[in-house]
A protein has these predicted regions:
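N-terminal active-site beta-alpha-beta segment that forms phosphate/nucleotide-binding
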Residues: 2-122
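Conserved phosphate- and dinucleotide-binding cores of soluble alpha/beta proteins
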Residues: 89-167
Length: 167
């Protein structure tokens, strides 16, 4: 039990340090990172045909995913954004396209309107606080994406792509 609380505390401190670092990033750095990822697109996945790709409504200090989503929309992919269903529950996904209005959900995060179709993504873009060289990710600690990936992978193969800033 003591080790577990040490790990929890270590993660809490790491999250605070990374959030402070991200808050210090200048607008130019943030924009260049978003443009670089949008220029790459999802070419590295060698996706054939139209996939359902779920992005996320970026929080102020998160990676800006909008340029990538606009590119994917132009390429013919169907887009979705997550919707919070409540604490300790997996995310739900509703169809979204650039220009669609968003409602403010939990924590002020933009979510598609309730009349948008529920969809199951093939590719999930995941916001990360951090990652390491082995690909292990550090999220915000709520477990939403862990639960969501577990649910989706029980239904079908799904690809998750983490997006974060690199120091």
């Amino acid at each position: 039990v003591g080790e577990r609380s040490d790990i929890v505390e270590e993660k809490r401190l790491l999250r605070a340090r990374i959030r402070a670092w991200r808050a210090g990033l200048d607008a130019g750095t943030v924009a260049r990172a978003a443009d670089a990822v949008a220029a790459q697109g999802l070419d590295f996945l060698q996706v054939r045909g139209s996939a359902v790709v779920s992005g996320f409504a970026s929080l102020p200090d998160e990676f800006r995913v909008w340029p990538l989503l606009r590119r994917l929309h132009r390429e013919g992919h169907r887009l979705a954004l997550p919707v919070m269903q409540g604490k300790a529950r997996p995310l739900l996904f509703r169809a979204w396209a650039p220009g669609d209005a968003l409602d403010r959900g939990v924590w002020g995060i933009g979510e598609p309107k309730a009349d948008k179709a529920i969809v199951e993504p093939d590719i999930l873009l995941v916001p990360l606080l951090a990652f390491d060289r082995r690909g292990w990710r550090l999220g915000y600690g709520g477990g939403f994406y862990d639960r969501t990936l577990q649910r989706l992978r029980a239904l079908q193969p799904i690809v998750a792509v983490g997006l974060a800033f690199d120091e």
